[in-house]
């Protein structure tokens, strides 16, 4: 607390997460009182909460424990915490761990006393997998390489004030599924396994009042925003080319936001990109280099799974590799990785205070690529 109490990101202190012994009311209230005193003594400016665990079962709302908190927090079960507020409207309430689905969002959006939610989780993580061979949780808005997933764009369409639009293709029945997960799989591509004439189901996430969908320049119709925050959907007869969504709002002076997906051809080359060009020579100085398998026109090939090898020279070293495949058992500390959904990443660290770094990516049958980086910069 003393280390972080002046940091502007601190808005609440938590006295515990999913404490299972709260049914012993007097014991748990005594412990909680001591914790609250420590928080208030060391920082009287910020409120204290606790992530209650099934408080209806442990009677936390009726035995006085919840009302010891400045802000009542509960994990999941949004209807319970809303009922607790209705029971006692002076309670300030917050979701301390919540799912990322639409029902959870609507509980927040449509109930002003519900001050906010902490979503589990922002990024996919190792562990808590559903079943072997999956070794990670796919519940994040971002995958393990930092790429925004469809759920992330969906949440952005609910939360952001900046106009946005994102197209996602729902994986057809029989098409390869790439994750073990409960929600239908969506991919940001227009390259299905089946290239013969058939229908594809498309979801568009957008906070714009109107979205119009185009396939190869032909309009497939415009749809208004749904009051229940559900995505706008189209059934699209597949043909190769460009699928484009255009989002519009009133009083935009004709300006619009767009997103498009393009059908990929055969894999032809590796394209390298990085999140920075200079890497500080310190413990957390790291650069993420993304290797994308593309066709001859530079269009990413989403189904490519080539084994990509990385070689580095100069003042750098490969710290780890990854591809965001939650069923992959490949080692992270290596210099090669299979592409997953057409891409993988290498994490590069500086091996000297200054100097040039060259990273090359190769794979059988693909044109190789090299990216120039440098050690140095802010420390």
Region locations from a protein language model:
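Substrate-binding clefts and catalytic carboxylate motifs of secreted carbohydrate-active enzymes
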Residues: 11-14, 32-55, 63-71, 76, ...
């Amino acid at each position: 607390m003393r280390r972080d109490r002046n940091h502007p990101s601190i808005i609440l202190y938590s006295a515990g997460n999913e404490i299972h012994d709260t049914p012993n009311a007097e014991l748990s209230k005594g412990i909680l009182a001591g914790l609250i005193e420590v928080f208030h003594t060391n920082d009287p400016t910020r409120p204290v909460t606790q992530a209650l665990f099934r408080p209806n079962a442990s009677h936390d709302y009726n035995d006085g424990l919840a009302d010891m908190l400045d802000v009542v927090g509960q994990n999941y079960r949004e209807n319970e915490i809303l009922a607790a507020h209705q029971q006692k409207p002076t309670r300030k309430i917050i979701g301390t761990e919540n799912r990322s689905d639409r029902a959870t969002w609507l509980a927040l959006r449509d109930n002003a006393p519900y001050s906010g939610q902490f979503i589990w989780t922002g990024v996919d993580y190792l562990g808590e997998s559903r079943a072997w061979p999956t070794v990670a949780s796919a519940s994040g808005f971002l995958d393990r390489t930092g790429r925004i997933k469809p759920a992330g764009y969906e949440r952005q369409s609910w939360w952001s004030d900046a106009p946005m639009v994102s197209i996602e293709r729902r994986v057809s029945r029989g098409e390869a599924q790439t994750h073990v997960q409960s929600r239908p799989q969506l991919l940001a591509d227009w390259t299905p396994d089946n290239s013969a004439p058939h229908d594809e189901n498309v979801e568009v996430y957008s906070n714009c009042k109107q979205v119009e969908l185009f396939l190869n320049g032909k309009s497939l119709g415009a749809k208004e925003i749904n009051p229940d925050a559900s995505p706008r959907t189209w059934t699209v007869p597949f043909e190769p080319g460009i699928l484009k969504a255009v989002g519009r709002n009133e009083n935009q002076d004709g300006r619009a936001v767009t997103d498009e997906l393009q059908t990929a051809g055969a894999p032809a080359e590796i394209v390298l990109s990085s999140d920075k060009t200079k890497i500080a020579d310190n413990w957390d100085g790291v650069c993420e280099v993304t290797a994308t398998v593309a066709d001859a026109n530079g269009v990413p090939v989403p189904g490519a799974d080539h084994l990509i090898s990385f070689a580095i020279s100069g003042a750098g070293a490969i710290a780890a590799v990854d591809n965001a495949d939650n069923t992959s058992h490949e080692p992270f500390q290596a210099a090669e990785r299979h592409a997953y959904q057409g891409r993988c990443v290498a994490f590069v660290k500086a091996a000297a205070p200054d100097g040039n770094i060259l990273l090359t990516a190769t794979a059988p049958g693909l044109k190789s690529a090299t990216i120039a980086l440098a050690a140095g910069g802010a420390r």
